[in-house]
Amino acid sequence: MNSVTKAGAPQFWMGGVLARDLIEVSSDPSCLADGDFWAISTTYEGEFRAAKFKTITNEAFPAVSPTARVSGKWESSTSESEYIQYVEKIREKIASGGVYQVNACRRISIKSSATLDLAFANILKSNPAPFASYLRFTDMEIASASPELFLTRDCDQIKTSPIKGTKRSSSEKFGNKDRAENIMIVDLMRNDLGQICIPGSIAVPDLLRDEDHPGLSHLVSDVTGTLRSGITWAEILTALLPAGSISGAPKSAAKRIIAELEPTARGTYCGVLGWVHGDQAVLSVAIRTFWRESEFIHFGTGAGITWSSDARAEWEETQLKAERLISIVGGQL
């Protein structure tokens, strides 16, 4: 049976874990060393926010009183023609060397007073993503339908599961571009984990797995490692952020191109969202994610660009990733 949380009260929910009764908020990753339960959110740009909660229970997402859905037209930070130009500029940079893949994103926004807890409750019913999560405290509210694992940690064992490759149905086949993209990011994540793991412990136990998700199929791989003794959460996050799947390869070059060519900061989109409890953790990549800033609700969508990308097809992929969730939350894309 669903519990009921006071409207507007700080809370966190992910995978049947409900956290309530906020104790403190921190912007310093060293707070995670105290061994307590923290819900965390980082932005793509690296801003860290964490909330410590007193009461942790295993239960369904709390019941939400029905309110108005989002209505109206969502506006994109980048038009179709502008996005196509962005993709072509990335392809030019790939042709000149120095970068192999860049994740090209855009933000869609709408002015709305609708609450994201109702949006999240509807997402859980109609789009039950494996890493769906909800976080609300102080001025932050996030409702995520993420399909992608940023990391799990169990003592000294760590795993990341990057997604590269998206198609509409399980009957279609992933193309060479999808497989090449995924392998590039697997190599990148092996390198990132190598900064914090025992030499020789990095493994790829599952490569190019076809996963079905609500309305979509994704190509997923697992990369694992054994953490070095004494490694801190601050060191882990520094080594791995931002996620390779939403930046590109090489990561440093892709980040420079994104900063140069994308018209708005990504913010919550493409950061991470989840929980840390001592040496245990589940963190998702904050894709398929809604978040509130003042009077506006935002949603991000993007596609991985390689030399073989077709710019118009990449735009259509960003539409595909957005359309199902927008139909659930409300408004017109």
Where do the protein language model's features map onto the residues?
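Extended alpha-helical targeting/anchoring segments
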Residues: M1-L333
